[in-house]
Amino acid sequence: MKRFIALFAALAIALVASANDRPVRYDQLPTRAKNFIEEYFPSHSFSYAKYDNSIGDNNYDVVFTDGTEIEFNRRGEWRKINCKRGSIVPASLFPTSIVSYLGQHHPTQNIVEADRDALRWEVKLTNGIEYTFDRHGQIKWMDD
């Protein structure tokens, strides 16, 4: 048992030590990420970015002066958006079915957080309600 715990601790330390966050300039971001920022967040001022070269997960984290954060994968595709201080996630980033559902059930609310991968979309509204949709935009889960 002690060997198992020691092995587990060594593995955990190795994984944490392998995280390699390094600062990057705006011009070092993937072209796709820069185009995304310029199209969907043109009024936001860039604060800093870092490249996370963790095992199995390479991504860019971009932070704006208002605190809004966007995570991009290594190809420059957005994965997570967390808006701050009155900023909102543009509805045009989502499938029509998600926009229609949210517009019908929460017409006065905006999306302030979004997370996506190949299988699902997650959104958080200004009123705190969170939804998970499948990749086709069908609702799968809701948390208020």
Model-flagged regions — what are they?
Residues 20-144:
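Interaction-mediating elements
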Residues 10-18:
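Hydrophobic h-region of N-terminal signal peptides that target proteins for export
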Residues 2-8:
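Sec-dependent signal peptide recognition
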